[in-house]
Amino acid sequence: MPVQHRTTVVGNTSTLKSPVGILRILEVIFACVTFSLVVHTGRWTGRIGDLCMFCWCFCFAVSLVILIVEFTGVQNRMPVSWKNFPITFAMYAVLMCLSATVIYPLQYLEDKAYSSEVRNYQIVAIVFSCLTTLAYIIEVSLTRAKPGEVTGYMATTPGLLKVLETFIACIIFVFISDPPLYDRHDALKWCLAVYCICFILSIVVIILCVGECTGWLPCAFNKFLSGYALLAVLMYASAMIIWPIFSFDRKHGGTASRPSNCRSSPGNLYAVCEWDKMVAVAVLTAVNLIAYVMDLVYSARLIFITV
């Protein structure tokens, strides 16, 4: 009789039993439950619903891929730096899931036309979205660089700030582009240039770190980071001054007070009146300026980095 050979699948189960591995399993489960409940209710149509659904599904898919890669032990074969990619994704996942957790109930729970059963499903989905966000927050806190630890740049405070800076810039682009709020004066176009240039440079830094391409730079990576952070602070400081002046000062064609016909939907980014959008851009500009100042301070203190 022919001898039958039993196929044994060997995997790195220790990664799944570690605190970070358990967190990633919970992230996959929580995200899956969240978008499954939302799909079951059928209450996610429109651009806002699509955005929330994309956040949950994207985080679920990438977390599952990370679990599979670490279980099979093929991190070294991946075309990305495994010291930088998981923490970068986890930070983006925190911001994406947090945004979806805030936006979804504002957009859909305020509608009283839904039955109590549908609302119950929506509430449970929001709870699981909160749990998903919390799991990613804990993962970031566990995997970020500790004092004195040599790790990937994206696990350091400046690396995490880069993720925050790009995410805030994306929100600014949403508010500033539909309708265009920068067409009224050339000074506002300068502000748009500031947001675009700093966003692109931050994305380039993230790509260089995740792709392990920092050696391509014509200068030392830490000097490039410090110089870029200083440039970003100066540019955002100018935007922080220029945007309010040319948006709210009547002498420069702005609107000082909120118009009486200004109506906004708190959960719909696309249904916010122009004046509220201008306020949001001013606030987000200030927040990003603070982030870049912190980035500059930490980058100046970061002496030795292994990417």
Curated annotation (Swiss-Prot):
Q: Gene Ontology terms, cellular component aspect?
A: membrane
MARVEL domain mapped to chain residues: 15-148, 153-304
Keywords linked to the UniProt accession: Membrane, Repeat, Transmembrane, Transmembrane helix
Annotated transmembrane regions? 19-39, 51-71, 85-105, 123-143, 156-176, 190-210, 228-248, 278-298
Q: What does the UniProt entry say about where the protein is found?
A: Membrane
Keyword DNA-binding present in the record's keywords: the answer is: no
Recorded topology in the membrane: Multi-pass membrane protein
Is the keyword Transcription assigned to this protein? no
UniProt lists the family membership as follows: Belongs to the MAL family.
The protein here is known as Myeloid-associated differentiation marker homolog
Q: Which organism is it from?
A: Xenopus laevis
